[in-house]
């Protein structure tokens, strides 16, 4: 078959139009470059390459070796890491590989609770991490909604974990990695940082680099780093062999060389002045967005943001669940996601909050002015859900999208 199946093609066209016509505020999403798109869909998808560069279990790997080697060196340079592995298929698999490399089943681990901003793979009971290891949790201060380091230290001293996990999927403030290191050293624990959300900010100098303090750092490559979908592990040189063995053959077989090429392209892009300008704009936009949301009567978790994301409490201020808020906003062309907030009493599929981010629309060209306008639209939609108001707001969203087009050259 030399053409795309018509049923798939119809959905593909629909998705292109959706991306073009919606304001994308999901904090974990971004728009990749044309080069990343090309590499992800390139002939590299045909190549099997179990193993690592120059140590493969298949022949014909000289060119994929070249690409992967470039990526390893770039990642080490950008993040000041002793070792880098680009093969994890996802952030979750990167986390799994690290756990398998450093822990035995049943070992104690301390991490951030899900409602405070942690991730499923940080010990949530229904996840493999919660099943295989003995996780204990820290959270945030009830007043400031920022990480409660007194609680972190208390939990760590009480349970004497082998590993401490810092990092989150919904935390809007700078994380003090130095404090985590100091607490880890009190009990001789290893420190892992999951920087999936902030990797691009770290690469561009808009957030402190966790490699300065962590033994190992995991990340996705498709959020603020703006690369092909996948994962990556950075570590101190002395544990590099353990990490590599845990990825292959421990948890994966053949790597996705097309996706690795897309990751490497993104790393090349991240190592430029233009990318540094981009991530600083992401943070500037986020701060302006947060202020405008607050000015329009929205309650911000942790009273603001230092990175690309903002968590909003919609249930306790507007009497709208996160689930309903997500639907209301999507009906006018704004895409966000329902999200738990600290001490949330709602179920994870309902939630009291929503999470929004600035990475994707900053890629599209939005500056502070546009995010102030979006904040007003969001507040208006959640406060007045009348058909007349939502229709008016939908037109405003469409106008903004038209002013900042994306992927105009693509046609399917």
UniProtKB/Swiss-Prot annotation:
From the UniProt record, report the name of the gene that encodes this protein: glyA
What's this protein's name? Serine hydroxymethyltransferase
Q: What does this protein do?
A: Catalyzes the reversible interconversion of serine and glycine with tetrahydrofolate (THF) serving as the one-carbon carrier. This reaction serves as the major source of one-carbon groups required for the biosynthesis of purines, thymidylate, methionine, and other important biomolecules. Also exhibits THF-independent aldolase activity toward beta-hydroxyamino acids, producing glycine and aldehydes, via a retro-aldol mechanism.
Indicate yes or no for the key word Cytoplasm.
yes
Pathway given in the UniProt record: One-carbon metabolism; tetrahydrofolate interconversion; Amino-acid biosynthesis; glycine biosynthesis; glycine from L-serine: step 1/1
**Assembly and binders:** Homodimer.
State the organism of origin: Mesoplasma florum (strain ATCC 33453 / NBRC 100688 / NCTC 11704 / L1)
Which InterPro entries does the UniProt entry name for this protein? PyrdxlP-dep_Trfase (IPR015424), PyrdxlP-dep_Trfase_major (IPR015421), PyrdxlP-dep_Trfase_small (IPR015422), Ser_HO-MeTrfase (IPR001085), Ser_HO-MeTrfase-like (IPR049943), Ser_HO-MeTrfase_PLP_BS (IPR019798), SHMT-like_dom (IPR039429)
From which domain of life does this come?
Bacteria
């Amino acid at each position: 078959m030399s053409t795309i199946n018509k049923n798939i093609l119809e959905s593909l066209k629909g998705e292109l139009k959706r991306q073009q016509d919606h304001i994308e505020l999901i904090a974990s999403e971004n728009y990749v470059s044309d080069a990343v798109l090309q590499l992800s869909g390139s002939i590299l998808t045909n190549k099997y390459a179990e193993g690592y560069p120059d140590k493969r279990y298949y022949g014909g790997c000289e060119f994929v070796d070249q690409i992967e080697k470039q990526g390893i060196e770039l990642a080490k340079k950008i993040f000041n890491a002793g070792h880098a592995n680009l093969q994890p298929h996802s952030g979750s698999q990167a986390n799994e590989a690290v756990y398998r490399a450093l822990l035995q089943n049943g070992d104690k681990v301390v991490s951030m609770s899900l409602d405070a901003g942690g991730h499923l793979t940080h010990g949530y009971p229904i996840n493999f991490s919660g099943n295989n290891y003995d996780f204990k949790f820290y959270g945030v201060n009830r007043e400031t909604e920022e990480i409660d380091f007194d609680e972190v230290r208390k939990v760590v001293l009480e349970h004497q974990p082998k590993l401490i996990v810092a990092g989150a999927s919904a935390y809007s403030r700078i994380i003090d990695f130095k404090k985590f290191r100091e607490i880890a050293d009190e009990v001789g624990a290893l420190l892992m940082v999951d920087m999936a959300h902030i990797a691009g900010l770290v690469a561009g100098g808009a957030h402190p680099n966790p490699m300065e303090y962590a033994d190992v750092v995991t990340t996705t490559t498709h959020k603020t780093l703006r690369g092909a979908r996948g994962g990556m592990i950075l570590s101190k040189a002395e544990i590099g062999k353990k990490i590599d063995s845990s990825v292959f053959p421990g948890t994966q077989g053949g790597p996705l060389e097309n996706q690795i090429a897309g990751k490497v392209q993104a790393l090349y892009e991240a190592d430029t002045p233009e990318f540094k300008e981009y991530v600083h704009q992401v943070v500037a936009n986020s701060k302006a967005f947060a202020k405008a949301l607050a000015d329009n009567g929205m309650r911000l978790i942790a009273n603001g943001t230092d990175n690309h994301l903002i968590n909003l409490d919609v249930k306790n201020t507007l009497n709208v669940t996160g689930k309903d808020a997500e639907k209301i906003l999507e009906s006018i062309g704004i895409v966000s996601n329902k999200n738990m907030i600290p001490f949330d009493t709602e179920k994870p599929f309902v939630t009291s909050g929503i999470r929004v981010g600035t990475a994707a629309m900053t890629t599209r060209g939005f500056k502070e002015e546009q995010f102030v306008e979006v904040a007003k639209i969001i507040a208006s939609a959640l406060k007045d859900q009348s058909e007349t108001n939502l229709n008016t707001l939908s037109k405003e969203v469409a106008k903004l999208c038209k002013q900042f087009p994306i992927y105009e050259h693509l046609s399917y």
